[in-house]
Swiss-Prot record:
Top-rank taxon: Bacteria
Residues where CTP binds: S18, D151, I152, E153, K191, T192, K193, P194, T195, Q196, K227
Record-listed E.C. numbers: 6.3.4.2
Pathway involvement of the protein, from the record: Pyrimidine metabolism; CTP biosynthesis via de novo pathway; CTP from UDP: step 2/2
Name of the molecule in the record: CTP synthase
Catalytic residues in the record: C383 (nucleophile), H510, E512
NCBIfam families: PRK05380.1, PyrG
Region (Amidoligase domain): 1-270
Length: 543
């Protein structure tokens, strides 16, 4: 580790349009500094008024990423963990809603002693406290500011980082601004005007960017970089391309090739050995040697925005890479499935039902589960996916035709899935969240996958298996092979398997939150291997 005299702060903002890749840029900066031996952490400041994204629609917001300590956070924290291996916490993501919630609680308790509570200094002070909290042992803190410069919601956050930049001075802060340089194909031109306007907007709140990352298909010419440098008051060497890549794990190497980490350290007047990027080069080399292709069907209802399944997609990609396999995902809207599925699954090698909420599309998922069970197709059910596998089995094997979850039918006669009693409160913040130990049966497929009797996985659910049906389900071949302890040492079902099926597993937890490109999660590794085995078996039958 490098011993710096003080912690350095890197602020990443975005302009022109949203979804440019600020989170990936921040994660890449973290990975590059980490590869040089520095101790880093990453934080995200979200400008929306929700306290957290837990009750936001995945179609609007994307995935809710869950941390070990049970925080429901922005999906960018998933990128942070996958790129750096540094576990994020509830202290690494804040929203405008959380700031105001804390502010009003303090005001009601009399903490402000009769002061007129205002945006400046009271709101900005709380944001500053979040950014600066528990950073003394770190070399670098990388803070991503959500949204786009110019959004009214972002103004308190921008004012806060301006204040920190002023108080800590240029020697301890750097401002990185990500913009878009659109390419006009009709005239074959790159347009720099949006970047100029974005920097002007940022400057209007008192922040002068030190480095400009420009998102583009191709690099700017030296003349174009000089133009931006002159108009935006940024050195030409600090105008760095954020080029489109086929694989997001190319980004750290790409940014290093264009000297992003070098220029950041130069700004701070820090000398450092070159980064060790061997693991990044290795993962890219492995990803290019795929010899087979498998197709996995994912049945969900949020498929209009694939960011709703971001960690799941990445976990499958990690496992495919380490199995030297190219992954093809066949996305199926669960609401489109009915009993006439005919050729829907003819060319798939596995079926996966991810987590979700609500009864919309549930019957389509159950149809897919039945198809996987009957036809011996590898199946993985996650969270609701596991619960629906139990409902399908209860209905179609045990013939409890009205078996259901109380989430979908509160008055059903056979509630094989029901709500945890202590969670029948508010919708927001009312789930079993975060990492908990799970105890596996030794004589089970899940144990052979993990090779550990006690595992720790992250949860996000408020419904669980009704264990009054456990003996009945097991007597027909659906086996419970993992459990966790609950209030008063009660058990919660965590893993199910089908006794007479090559690979049929349901898990209540979310394994996708703990996968990374360098060490694929064992459950997804096994799932991909099962898919390859099924593909091979199917090929032999055809031949």
């Amino acid at each position: 580790m490098n011993n710096l005299t003080s912690t350095k702060f890197i602020f990443v903002t975005g302009g022109v349009v949203s979804s440019l890749g600020k989170g990936l840029a921040a994660a890449s900066i973290g990975a590059l500094l980490q590869a040089r031996g520095f101790k880093i952490c990453l934080r995200k400041l979200d400008p929306y008024l929700n306290i957290d994204p837990g009750t936001m629609s995945p179609i609007q917001h994307g995935e809710v990423f869950v941390t070990d300590d049970g925080a429901e956070t922005d999906l960018d924290l998933g990128h942070y963990e996958r790129f750096t291996g540094v576990k994020t916490t509830k202290n690494d993501n804040i929203t405008t809603g959380k700031v105001y919630h804390n502010l009003l609680n303090k005001e009601r308790k009399g903490d402000y002693l009769g002061q007129t509570v205002q945006i400046i200094p009271h709101v900005t002070d709380l944001i500053n406290s979040f950014i600066l909290h528990n950073t003394d042992a770190l070399d670098f803190v990388i803070c991503e500011i959500g949204g786009t410069v110019g959004d009214i919601e972002s103004q308190p956050f921008l004012e806060s980082i301006r204040q920190i930049g002023y108080k800590l001075s240029k020697n301890n802060t750097v401002f990185v601004h990500l913009t878009l340089v659109p390419y006009i194909s009709a005239t074959m031109e790159l347009k720099t005007k949006p970047t100029q306007h974005s920097v002007k907007e940022l400057s209007s709140v008192g922040i002068q960017p030190d480095i400009i990352l420009y998102r583009s298909k191709i690099p700017l010419s030296q003349e174009q970089r000089d133009k931006i440098a002159n108009l935006c008051n940024v050195s030409p060497t600090n105008i760095i391309p954020a080029l489109d890549v086929k694989n997001i794990y190319e980004l750290p190497i790409s940014y290093h090739q264009y000297n992003l980490d070098t220029q950041i350290l130069k700004h701070f007047n820090i000398t450092s050995p070159e980064p060790n990027l061997d693991k990044w080069e290795n993962i890219l080399n492995i990803s290019h040697v795929s010899t087979k292709t498998i197709t996995i069907a994912i049945i969900g209802k949020y498929i209009k925005l694939l960011d709703a399944y971001k960690s799941l997609i990445e976990a499958l990609e990690h496992a495919a890479i380490h199995n030297k396999t190219k992954l093809s995902i066949h996305w199926i809207d669960s609401r489109s499935l009915n009993n006439e599925i005919t050729n829907t699954f003819d060319n798939v090698h596995a079926i996966l039902i991810p987590g979700g909420f609500g009864d919309d599309g549930v019957e389509g998922k159950i149809i897919a589960i039945q198809y996987a069970r009957i036809n011996n197709i590898p199946f993985l059910g996650i969270c609701m996916g596991m619960q629906l596998a139990i409902i399908e089995f209860a209905r179609n094997v045990i013939h409890l035709e009205d078996a259901n979850s109380t989430e979908f039918n509160f008055y059903c006669k056979n509630p094989v899935i029901h709500q945890l009693p202590e969670l029948q409160q508010n919708l927001g913040g009312s789930m079993k969240l975060g990492s908990h130990p799970c105890y596996l049966k030794v004589d089970s497929k899940i144990f052979s996958i993990y090779k550990e009797q006690v595992i720790n996985e992250r949860r996000r659910h408020r419904y669980t298996v009704n264990l009054q049906y456990k003996d009945l389900l097991e007597s027909h071949g659906l086996i419970f092979t993992g459990h966790s302890h609950h209030n008063n040492n009660d058990s919660l079902a965590e893993v199910i398997e089908l006794k007479n099926h090559p690979w049929f597993i349901g898990v209540q937890f979310h394994p996708e939150f703990k996968s990374d490109p360098f060490q694929s999660h064992p459950l997804f590794m096994s799932f991909i291997q099962a898919s390859l085995n099924y593909q091979e078996t199917k090929r032999h039958k055809i031949s």
